[in-house]
Amino acid sequence: LAGLATHQPFSTLNWLLKTELDIDLVMLPFNRLGMFMDSTPASTVEAIRKVGKPVIGKKVLAAGYLSPRDALFYVAELGCIPVVALGIASEKEAKETFSAAVSAFSGMVAA
């Protein structure tokens, strides 16, 4: 698989709509606060749906500003980001974060 990772999700997704670049997936920052993003979450979701490629979300916890449960259920319920990459700093964080991820994404099938 050939993927593209970006720190500017909205700009990159809109660029992909105009280019001939054939990629299999996109990895981008996404969270309900819009932190580490170049547009609003709503605009980014719209762009994700237009591009129609599988998305891996990163920075979904907004560098710890959001609780794992709230952040992960928000992303999962959107239905357009079926995979997330999660950063953790301790065993306690890992247990809390991955438990929330399993609950939020259980039954979801990656696009």
Set out the residue ranges of the language-model regions.
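Beta/alpha (TIM)-barrel catalytic core signal, keyed to glycine-rich beta->alpha loops juxtaposed to Asp/Glu
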Residues: 1-111
